[in-house]
Design a protein with these regions (language model features):
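Extended, structured, electrostatic nucleic-acid-contact surfaces
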Residues: 48-56, 266
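Major-groove recognition helix of helix-turn-helix-like DNA-binding domains
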Residues: 55-75, 83
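Short, P/G- and charge-enriched loop/turn segments at secondary-structure junctions
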Residues: 121-123
C-alpha cells in the first residue's frame, strides 16, 4: 500500500538514498521515543547508527535531509497511509459496548500553545502562538479517525464544515457546536447528532414521552426550534432530553435528531 502511494504521488522522484519509507520510519521513531525536535531525533539516530540502519532508517540520515523531506514531499502519501491504517485498527478494535447500531463519534478541540518566535505562522495573541486540534474520535474503537489543524483563534463550530458525515453514524458534540444550519447538514446526510444544548435554547414543544425520573431523565420532548432565523436553519422536528447527572450534581440538556433510541441511551 505504501509503495503504491509513493508511486502515485511521485514521492521518490530523483531520490538516491533517503526514501519516503526511511522518512516515515524516522518520524515514527521520533514520535514513539518522545523526541522533542529534529535535532534531538538525529542525535539519537546517530548514536545508534548501526541499529538504526538495520531498522530501515537509511544511511546518512541528517537533520538537513530529514527537514527537506518533511518540507517538500507530498503529505498525501502519509495522510492516505494513515487513513488506511486507521481503517485496519478500527476493524480490529471494534466492540459493541454501546449496543447501538452504527459508529459513534465524539468531536472536540484542544488548543496547544506555541512559542511565537519559533512558530510565527501560528500567531494567536500578542505574545503567544497556538494551534487548535479538532479531533473526531471513534468511541467504540478508541481511535482518532480524523484530525483537523487550524489557527488557535478559529471558532470550534467552523471545523464541523470539514467532517464527512457517514450515513447512520452518531456524532456527539458539546455546547460550542450548537449551530442549527450545520446540525441540519448532519440530518440531510442521514446521520445522527447528540449535542448539549445551550441554556437559552428556544424550543417549542409538540409532545412528550413518559419518563422514569429515577433513571435521571427529567423529560423527553419532541418539538421544533423556535426563533425566526434558527427555525429556518433547522426546519424539521428535533428531540430534547433533560437529564440530571446525580454523580456530578449537574443538569444536562441534549438535542438530537434521533427518535428511536431511548432517552437513557441519548
Amino acid at each position: 500500500i505504501f509503495d503504491r502511494l509513493v508511486t502515485k504521488y511521485n514521492g521518490n522522484k530523483s531520490v538516491k538514498h533517503f526514501t519516503c519509507w526511511n522518512q516515515l520510519l524516522c518520524m515514527l521513531f521520533g514520535q514513539l521515543s518522545s523526541r522533542e525536535s529534529l535535532r534531538d531525533l538525529i542525535i539519537v539516530i546517530e548514536a545508534h547508527q548501526s541499529k538504526s540502519y538495520h531498522l530501515g532508517f537509511g544511511k546518512n540520515v541528517t537533520r538537513s535531509n530529514l527537514s527537506k523531506a518533511n518540507e517538500n514531499r507530498n503529505f498525501k502519501i502519509f495522510e492516505d497511509f494513515a487513513n488506511h491504517l486507521i481503517l485496519i485498527a478500527q476493524e480490529k478494535n471494534s466492540n459493541d459496548s454501546f449496543e447501538i447500531k452504527g459508529t459513534v463519534y465524539a468531536f472536540d478541540s484542544s488548543t496547544i500553545d506555541l512559542c511565537l518566535s519559533v512558530f510565527w505562522w501560528a500567531h494567536f495573541r500578542k505574545t503567544k502562538a497556538g494551534i487548535k486540534l479538532h479531533t473526531l474520535f471513534d468511541i467504540n474503537t478508541q481511535i482518532p479517525v480524523f484530525i483537523h489543524i487550524t489557527e488557535a483563534n478559529v471558532h470550534d463550530v467552523n471545523a464541523m464544515d470539514v467532517i464527512k458525515y457517514e450515513p447512520f453514524a452518531y456524532y456527539i458534540f458539546d455546547r460550542a457546536y450548537v449551530d442549527y444550519l450545520r446540525l441540519y447538514r448532519i440530518t440531510k446526510s442521514d446521520a445522527y447528532f447528540v449535542v448539549r444544548a445551550k441554556s437559552n435554547v428556544k424550543f417549542k414543544r409538540m409532545y412528550s414521552k413518559k419518563t422514569d425520573k429515577s433513571t435521571g431523565v427529567i423529560y423527553d420532548q419532541t418539538g421544533k426550534i423556535d426563533g425566526f432565523y434558527t427555525s429556518k436553519d433547522y426546519p424539521e422536528k428535533i428531540r430534547k432530553v433533560k437529564f440530571f447527572d446525580a454523580e456530578n450534581k449537574k443538569m444536562l440538556i441534549f438535542l438530537t435528531n434521533n427518535f428511536d433510541l431511548s432517552a437513557q441511551q441519548i
